[in-house]
C-alpha cells in the first residue's frame, strides 16, 4: 500500500516516480497486489488525474475519495483490475458482499458525476499545469527566506519546513497560520 509520490500524513514528503516504478516491479515479481491510496493525491492534485500516472504504472487496486466529489460530500471508490474482479465472479460463496449504510448515496453519486463532467469540459488537468508551475516557483522562492529550511511541490501540492522547532508542537506554523488568517 502506497500513497503515490506524496506522503500527505507524513508531512508532505515527496518522492520520485522511480520509487513507485520499482515498487510496481517488485509487486509483479512476487505476485503481490499493489494498492495505491489516491485519496489525497488523486483527481489532479499532483498535476495528473492519478499520481501513479507520473510513474507510468497502474496499481491493482486504486482508492479514491476527497476530489471524487470535489471535497464537498463524503464519496469514495475502490477500483480494481479485471484480474481481481474476476476472483469474485461465479458461485455465490465467491461474491464480495460489501455494503454499509451509506453505500451508493444518490446525492454523492450525482456530485461525483458532475465533478467528472467539469474535469472534462473545463479541462481542469490542462489548467493544473500552469498552476503547478506557479506553485513550484512560489515555494522555490521561499527557500531563501529566514526560517524556511526545505521547500517542495508537485502539482497543486506545495509544502515547506519551518525552523524553530519540529513536529506538530512547533509554533512557527501557527504563527504563519495566524498571519494568513489576519490577512483574510
For every predicted segment, state its role:
Residues 1-184:
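Conserved N-terminal phosphate-binding loop of PLP-dependent enzymes in the Aspartate aminotransferase
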